[in-house]
Amino acid sequence: MLFKHLVPEANLVHHVSQRYFIMGAITRSNKSGLKTAENTSQVYPLATDIPTGIKKPKSNGVSKPKPKTKSKPIPKAPKNPSPIIDATDASIKKQTKVEPLEVPLDLTLPQEFLDYHTPGFIEGVKYCIERDPSLHPIIVRENFTGFGSKAFDEKLAKADDDRIHLYWYSLVRSVIAQQVSGAAAKSIEGKFKSLFTGGDDGVIPTAKATLDMSEEQLRSVGLSRPKVKYVQHISQVFANSNEKLTSLDFYRSATVDEIYNELCKLKGIGLWSAKMFAIFTMEELDVFAEDDLGVARGMAKYLEQRPHVLQRAKEEVANDDSKQTALKKRSKFYNKLDSKRTWKPIHDVYVLHIAEKFKPFRSAFMMILWRLSLTNIDVLDKE
């Protein structure tokens, strides 16, 4: 379970990858533009947890062919990128403070690892290994459960039919899970779904049916007053066919930053939440949340073992006036004199600069940093 800001860091474990919802991505354009927003915490459901089977409007007897769902093209990585760390045992030992732990000379991934994950995620981790071969052991230690190809394939088959409904439910479920334990979130979600038993839509929660619920009914399942407002607003937007977030054409034509803008207009959804939605629901391969505590801690541990990488980043940033100006601002995470942290936060400017070396697969790099952020790596993904 992932919590932000409201729980002790010792108990903060980034396991978003076990509780989100995956479906086929949509091909989009590459324009840019970004609006900032406040962070909120959320957890995304597994594909098997999403209610499906919405009653469709009766047809007039004329069937229309269903458009084929297009998978998002995997971005092309730069040709022959210079490695951050050379792909040799001697170099890994020299440039890091860890043993290489059986890094194969050809940097291949185990077949079972390849079979488990989606093609896009595999390309992402391959690129990360190409940039830094010393990441190989941490990558292959466990599967990244949020990027399993089976769940991806099952959802891809009917993605366009239920996509907007699933987008709505994923966002509502993220609000339910904000600032509560995993057990509490599961309990509240179960009670929320039980509200719809016996309704016109059967047991399937929908945006329209949610709007028909009174505030008292929604409060009765354990939602706070602010969360009730968030759920109602998200449902109001997704019940309106004229809204951008209910249009598949919008998701196909908009850039990820433009989608962030629309998501951040929803009550209860901030930029951090929008980025998690982009990674785990839309399967974006180049998302990076530098303001995430797990990312900050993972980067600190990554650089603690690779001090020359930080030194090189500082030298490169020194030649960039805009980044030098940004360095004058206080970093998102910093240690106070009485801090009990066992790790030293790195300034956001350096975190972003180093992450840029893993474009266009920063989502995979972020998952690796989350894994590195765990004090006891053996408990990873075994909650």
Predicted stretch roles:
Residues I164-H165, Y169, Y251-T255, L266, ...:
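Residue-level marker of regulatory loop/turn positions in helix-turn-helix DNA-binding domains and
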Residues F280-A355:
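Phosphate-backbone recognition surface of nucleic-acid-processing proteins
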Residues F3, S17-R252, V317-N319, K323-Y334, ...:
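N-terminal polyanion-binding entry modules of DNA glycosylases/AP lyases
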Residues Y167-S170, L211-M213, K275-A278, K344-H347:
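Surface-exposed beta-strand-to-loop junctions
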Residues I176, A254-L303, A364, W370:
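Catalytic DNA-binding helix-loop module of base-excision-repair DNA glycosylases/AP lyases
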Residues E9, H15-Q18:
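Intrinsic disorder/low-complexity segments, especially N-terminal tails and targeting/processing regions
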Residues G198, Q236-K244, K265, I279, ...:
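Alpha-helix capping at helix-to-loop junctions
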